[in-house]
């Protein structure tokens, strides 16, 4: 996801899914 940061804005769905996974991971650690 970070590697495709330039296209992240053009792929909102993929970004949302990525953030959901990342959010869950961070929530688990927090």
UniProtKB/Swiss-Prot annotation:
Broad class of where this protein is predominantly found: plastid
Compartment annotation: Plastid, Chloroplast thylakoid membrane
Entry annotated with the keyword Coiled coil: no
One GO BP annotation of this record: photosynthesis
Domain of life of the native organism: Eukaryota
Keyword Disulfide bond appears in the UniProt entry: no
Protein keywords: Chloroplast, Membrane, Photosynthesis, Photosystem II, Plastid, Thylakoid
Gene Ontology cellular component annotations, sorted alphabetically: chloroplast; chloroplast thylakoid membrane; photosystem II
Record-stated family: Belongs to the PsbP family.
Cited function: May be involved in the regulation of photosystem II.
Protein name according to UniProt: Oxygen-evolving enhancer protein 2
